[in-house]
Amino acid sequence: MPPGKYRQMMRDLYVKEEKEMVQNEVKGWLLTGTNPALYTIKADYEVFHTGSKSGYLGAIQPAEEGQFGTMMQVFSAKNWLGKRMKMSCFIKTKDAMKCGAWCRIDTRNGDLLQFDNMDNRAINGTTDWNYYSIVLDVVEESAAIHFGVLLVGSGEVWIDGIVFEEVDTSVLSTNLASSAEELPLEPVNLGFDEL
């Protein structure tokens, strides 16, 4: 899914997040997405990479390419303002159509500032535990940091060993959101003469 389409979907999702959340037994974690009823989350005591359990997100009914579920949290950006933040984790998959870790940074009004859903390096199929990271800048107007793991379509995904840490600018950002650097420096075709 292209970043722009995903951003719009997540922006719409943010507005109705509370209405669409499915109750779960994993403290601090929410199950949401385009079709949360097609998915389940739990703490898995049998499959884990570090410690004694992992987070699990799986499709419980057939799900199609455009449908996704996400196991997520939201926290304040206050302690991260002005910093480059790295979220790292370990992910394992089974028959996953498409999945990955994700992180989104929003303003107080819910406008997107920074975003990465690993769409350009999505995980597919069955994989053993692998290390993944997302690096985003928490600019001064940031208010909320959303993060988690998403599963597009069917399959299963486990996440473990999630760590947030500050990194310096030598660590490249993975931001997929449109930036001003991609915009033209001046308006174009104002007379509509060019085709």
Q: Where are each of the predicted segments found?
A:
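Extracellular and organelle-lumenal recognition/adhesion modules and their flexible linkers in secreted
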Residues: P2-L195
